[in-house]
Amino acid sequence: MKEIIIWSAYLDAEKSRKEGRKIPKELCVNNPKIKDIYNSLRKLGYNAEIVKNKCHPKEWWEIVGYIKVKVNDDIPKLEILKKICENLKK
């Protein structure tokens, strides 16, 4: 098992790659909330934990928090991000 960090910026269609978006815009959602991402991960069966009062390194002035997720070593992070967005769009 490994632990990965997911910031809302990774899934935000309004952000550029330079600002932290990790997947293509077509797959992203507009302004995803940490709570929605957390709920999506729980629906997908992942063990997740919200960490509040943290700033994304590219937006150090904005306190948003992130999510820690425990996943199997063989699952790529981008695969999980795509699944989250699919779930959020439903």
From Swiss-Prot:
GO terms for molecular function: 7S RNA binding. GO terms for cellular component: signal recognition particle. GO terms for biological process: SRP-dependent cotranslational protein targeting to membrane, signal sequence recognition. The keyword RNA-binding applies. It holds the Pfam family SRP19. It comes from the Archaea. Its main location: cytoplasm. Keywords: Cytoplasm, Ribonucleoprotein, RNA-binding, Signal recognition particle. It is found in: Cytoplasm. Involved in targeting and insertion of nascent membrane proteins into the cytoplasmic membrane. Binds directly to 7S RNA and mediates binding of the 54 kDa subunit of the SRP. Belongs to the SRP19 family. Part of the signal recognition particle protein translocation system, which is composed of SRP and FtsY. Archaeal SRP consists of a 7S RNA molecule of 300 nucleotides and two protein subunits: SRP54 and SRP19. This is Signal recognition particle 19 kDa protein. The gene is srp19.
